[in-house]
Amino acid sequence: MTLDLTDLQQRLRAFAAARQWQPYHTPKNLAMALMVEAAELQELFQWLTPEESQQLTADPAQKERVGEEMADVLLYLLQLADHTGVDLRDAVERKLVKNAIKHPAPPADPASADGP
């Protein structure tokens, strides 16, 4: 799946404008809404064992709920990036480079060349 982030941001802008929500879509409010949606996603997994959490989306209804909450998180993140002028593509690329430096992969073990 390929997501066109710019297209999604434009659609979200139009959606909010059609409902006259722009005054409420401040960085503070969007960040707070993002956290509420992330908490709703977390709630689906909250009291599950690690094994149960890995199997949650085997149930189509639960998979739908998880997907909806993930979509809410992504949509608020896109709106927050749009309102703060953060280019998410650039931010992600820079962060991946930083993470690779901060957490380098261990040297390959010749004895395990076949993989796990």
Located regions from the model:
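Flexible "arm" and connector segments at domain edges
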Residues: 1-116
